From Swiss-Prot:
Pfam families from the UniProt entry: H2O2_YaaD
Family statement: Belongs to the UPF0246 family.
Native species: Salinispora tropica (strain ATCC BAA-916 / DSM 44818 / JCM 13857 / NBRC 105044 / CNB-440)
Superkingdom of this protein's organism: Bacteria
Entry GO terms, CC: cytosol
InterPro entries: YaaA
Recorded coiled-coil stretches: none
Gene Ontology BP term (one): response to hydroperoxide
HAMAP family membership: UPF0246
Protein name: UPF0246 protein Strop_2927
């Protein structure tokens, strides 16, 4: 069983040494893409990514400094700081959990295509849905083609916890029957009805991935046993290959990297 998540825009700086890094499966393509991105101006980054001048300048600097030297890299699982990674809490995974994750967890990335947890990467900013100025890089779905999907096993269940912007890079090439796509809902205290809350769902996806790894869940039938940060399986709201989990009171507020939008 493979677990899919995606990268976050927020990243942590690479620590100084100590980690044993693996090499991304599609690093040659990532180098090609990064080499192109080094040619873009601050203004082109601002236009393509809809960034403020300050953030565009920072993004330009990230690619100007980008390289593949191990001393400038950190494991992918430790490099991201968005809400999904707040739920994943990679820093608390045991060495045995991380070793298990290396064979199960895959991270979809605009720059690297697909990453294993211990793959060495540098800070960057490139979402899969960005439209870049020049072909063949203008459309990243076309740039990557089926290369990312070919990095996944040919058979077996894929637990899809990635955003649609990212999972499209694999779902269009693989049988839909292979995918299990959990949904995470929060009860509205005013109406008593379940609703989709973006930040809650992102943190829940990370917590779900963490639980699958820590509990060594191998049988897809056991997915319904997830009961972390307030969530419980809700059969009435579930569909085939789309199990629904509902929380009465969200238990992941303390995990979020955000200061708001948690209501």
């Amino acid at each position: 069983m493979i677990i899919l998540i995606h990268t976050s825009k927020a990243m942590r700086p690479a620590p100084q040494g100590g980690a044993t890094l693996t090499v991304p499966a599609l690093r040659d393509r990532a180098e090609e893409l990064a080499t192109y991105l080094k040619t873009l101006s601050v203004e082109q980054f601002a236009a393509a990514m809809e960034l403020s001048p300050e953030l565009a300048d920072r993004t330009h600097g990230l690619f100007a400094d980008w390289g593949t030297e191990p001393e400038r890299q950190s494991p992918a699982i430790d490099s991201f700081a968005g809400d999904i990674y707040s739920g994943l809490r990679a820093c608390d995974l045991t060495p045995a959990d991380r070793a298990y994750a290396e064979g199960r967890l895959r991270i979809l990335s605009g720059l690297y295509g697909i990453l294993r947890p211990e793959d060495g990467i540098q800070p960057y900013r490139l979402e899969m849905g960005y439209r870049l100025p020049d072909p063949p890089y203008a459309n990243l779905y076309q740039f990557w083609g089926d290369a990312v999907a070919r990095c996944l096993p040919r058979t077996g269940v894929i637990v899809d916890l990635a955003a649609v912007e990212y999972n499209r890079i694999v779902t269009r090439f693989l049988s839909r029957d292979r995918f299990v796509s959990p949904r995470f809902l929060t009860i509205n205290p005013k109406t008593g009805e379940p609703r989709f809350v973006v930040v809650h769902a992102k943190i829940a996806r990370g917590a779900f991935a963490r639980w699958l790894l820590a509990a060594r869940v191998e049988d897809p039938a056991d997915i319904v046993d997830f009961a972390e940060i307030g969530y419980r399986y809700e059969p009435a709201l579930s569909k085939p290959r789309q199990p629904a989990f509902v929380c009465q009171e969200f238990g992941g507020k303390g995990l979020s990297v955000r200061r708001h939008d948690l209501g």
